[in-house]
Amino acid sequence: SDGEEIEQPEKIYYDQAQRRMNSNNFNGAIESLEAIENMYPFGKYAEQAQVELIYAHFMNSETEAAHSSAEKFIRLHPRHPNIDYAYFMKGLSSYTRDRDLFIRFSDTDISNRDISGEKQSFAELTEFLTRFPDSQYVQYAKQRNVYLRNMIAKNELAAADYYYSINAYVGAIRRANYVIENIPNSSENYRALKILENCYEALGYSELLEDVRVIILSLIHISEPTRPLHI
C-alpha cells in the first residue's frame, strides 16, 4: 500500500543474523553479518553488524577474529556510542579461555609457559577501565582483571619456584620482583617476598635479606586481626 515501507535486503540479512544468534547458531550469524558488511558497507545496519560480529566471533570461540573485529571497529568508529563495548571485548578476547596454566610438569622448564595472551588481556582491560570508568561493563572487567592479575602472578612465581629449585637464584629473583613491581595488588605478593627472602639468604645478600624481612613482618602485622571494640 501507499506509504508502506518495503523491507530491504539489508534488513533481511540483519533479521536473519538476529534469529541465528538467538538460537546460538553463531556460524550462521557471522555469515549474515559479514554479508551486510560486504554488500552494504554504508547501509543502515553496517555499523551495528560490525559491532555484533565481535560478539558472534567471541561466542563462536573465534577469539582472534573477535579481537580483530574489535580493533577494526575501534579504528573505523572511534566516537560510536558502543565504542566502550569494542574496547571491552578487545580485552576479553585476548585471553584464551581453554589454556591451562597450572599443569604440573615433572622435567619441563615451566618458565617457558606462554602467558602473553593473559598479559595482553590484562593491559587492554586496564585501558578500557581507564577510558570508560562509567561503562556498564566496568564491573565485569574489574572482576576479570583480578582473576588475570592473580593468574599472571601465580605463573610468574611457578617459574620462580622452578628457578629456585635448580639454584638459579637470579632468575627466581627476577620473576619474584616482576610480581612485586608490576602486579602489586595480587594475592601472591607475600609468596613473592618469601621467594626473595630465600634467594637472598642462599646468595648471602644480607642487606637485601634484612630489607625484605622488614617488609614481610609489616605485612604479617597488617594481616593480624584487631581486638574488638569496648562496648
Regions found by a protein language model. Give the residues of each.
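Short coil/linker segments at helix-helix boundaries
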Residues: 62-68, 94-124, 163, 167
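Post-signal-peptide N-terminal segment of Sec-exported extracytoplasmic proteins
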Residues: 5-60
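Single conserved hydrophobic/aromatic residue that forms the stacking wall/gate
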Residues: 221-231
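Short solvent-exposed coil/turn linkers within tandem alpha-helical repeat scaffolds
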Residues: 39-46, 75-85, 99-100, 115-116, ...
